Every structure is written in C-alpha cells, then in structure tokens.
C-alpha cells in the first residue's frame, strides 16, 4: 500500500501504531517498530489504546490482566521516541513523528503547526465536515457528532435531514481555553501577554487555580513559568497532554489524581 501511494504521487505517507494492546510488551513493540522503519513512512503516530468496554462491546472479551501496565506502556512510549529519533524522525510532540523534510516538521519549525481531534495538522482553523457513522465535524465555534448506528444514519439521510446526534457551541471561555491548549500542544510554550491581549483577561487572576497545578509540574521539571511565558521542557513534551489538561474545564474535579494514569 505504501509503495502504491508513493507511485501515485502521494506527498506524505503516514502510519498509525497503537501501544497498550493486550499481551503487548516492549520486545513485541520493538519488533513492530523494526518492520515499520524498514518501510520508511514520512510520518508516524503512536497512539495509546483506549480500553472502553462499556462503550465498545467487542472489547468486553479482553481481560484486564492481558493489558500492559502503565509502567510497561511508558517504557514502550520511551522506546518509540528513542528508536524513531535515532532513525532520523523529528518528534513533533505527544504522539507524532515526521521526517525532517515533511511539511509537518516544516510547519512546526515555522510556528504554523495546528492540532485538531484527529491529530497534528498544517491547516489551522479549517472547518471539518463529518461524513459517516459517529463522525465529528467542526464548523466555526461549533462541533457536531453524527449518530452512531448505520441504520439510523441512513434513515435520517433518507428523510432529508442531517444525521447529527449532538453538538456544542463554544463559549468565550471555551475558545480561550482552546487557544491555550493549542499553543501548548503545538508550540510547547504559551505567551501569557498574547492571551491577555487576545481575550481581554488578567491571566493570573483568571487561571489562579490552573497556575497552582502547573507549579507542581514545574517542581517536577516538566515546565517553567515566568512573567511572560509558560514553557514546556524536554522532559514535559512526552506529557504535554497532561499539562494541557490543566486548562480543560470539562474534566472532573479529581483530575489531579487521575491525570497521569489517563495519559499513559
């Protein structure tokens, strides 16, 4: 498939890998990496397996004892980062790697990198149209998800309506937090002054609770905070999702206890 894509002029070929699968370990994942590196894709994404048996019935056949521990998953992620960087890939952040010549790497270097719910992208603030069962779309400050069963999807389309199950319109606070999360995930730094000017807030007053959480991460060597910038350190890049989650208002109140276990 990769050879065919290149033969037909595809500019970039991406491969997704999942870690945390049943019976997976560091040795087996290393074998997978060796096979993938031999194919030399332009981009790789390393995703954490989401075990949600309450939502996905086939996952109920998987026993919890078959799943690798959090420690093993962290070792797998560290292995992936080391092997891919040694092979010449640039660590874009979180879960993405790309060759130095790839446009994703160029966008990161030029400060044009963007992230949506599908991953990193070179296209900032584009509307996304959702086609298919359970697909999620974004238009302006709104998000919408389609219905989750094929029969219902076709029935609604046949009746001349859009098969939307639910949606949300972002509030000014949502837009503010989205801008902060985007900056941290894409550029690994946040200009406090820029946020204050763009959203007309006093950052330290508005995010007093969040800054207290970040101070704990600062003590752990994940980031630094000064008068004008929040900067993610190299050790924090692997956990930038957890850093960004501090600003996610939709998380439960006990987020501090569960943040790292959810990320790894």
List the predicted regions and their residue ranges.
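Short, amphipathic alpha-helical interaction segments positioned at domain boundaries
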Residues: 235-264
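Residues at alpha-helix caps and immediate loop-helix transition turns in enzyme cores, especially N-
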Residues: 28-29, 206-209, 243
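C-terminal scaffold of the Radical SAM
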Residues: 1-204, 258, 262-264
């Amino acid at each position: 498939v990769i050879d065919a894509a290149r033969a037909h002029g595809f500019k970039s070929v991406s491969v997704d890998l999942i870690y945390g699968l049943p019976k997976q370990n560091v040795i087996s994942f290393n074998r997978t990496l060796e096979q993938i590196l031999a194919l030399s894709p332009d981009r790789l994404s390393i995703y954490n397996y989401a075990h949600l048996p309450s939502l996905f019935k086939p996952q109920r056949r998987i026993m919890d004892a078959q799943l690798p521990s959090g420690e093993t998953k962290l070792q797998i992620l560290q292995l992936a980062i080391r092997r891919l960087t040694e092979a010449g890939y640039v660590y874009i952040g979180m879960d993405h790697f790309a060759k130095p010549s790839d446009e994703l790497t160029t966008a990161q270097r030029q400060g044009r990198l963007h992230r949506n719910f599908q991953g990193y992208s070179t296209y900032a603030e584009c509307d996304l149209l959702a086609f298919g069962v359970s697909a999620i779309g974004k238009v302006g400050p709104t998000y919408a998800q389609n219905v989750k069963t094929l029969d219902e999807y076709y029935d609604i389309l046949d009746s001349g309506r859009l098969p939307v199950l639910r949606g949300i319109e972002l509030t000014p606070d949502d837009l503010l937090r989205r801008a902060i999360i985007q900056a941290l995930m894409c550029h690994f730094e946040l200009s406090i002054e820029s946020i204050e000017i763009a959203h007309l807030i006093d950052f330290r007053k508005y995010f007093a609770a969040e800054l207290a959480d970040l101070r704990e991460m600062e003590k752990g060597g994940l980031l630094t905070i000064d008068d004008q910038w929040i900067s993610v350190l190299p050790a924090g890049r692997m956990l930038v999702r957890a850093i960004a989650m501090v600003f996610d208002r939709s998380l439960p109140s006990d987020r501090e206890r569960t943040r790292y276990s959810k990320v790894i």
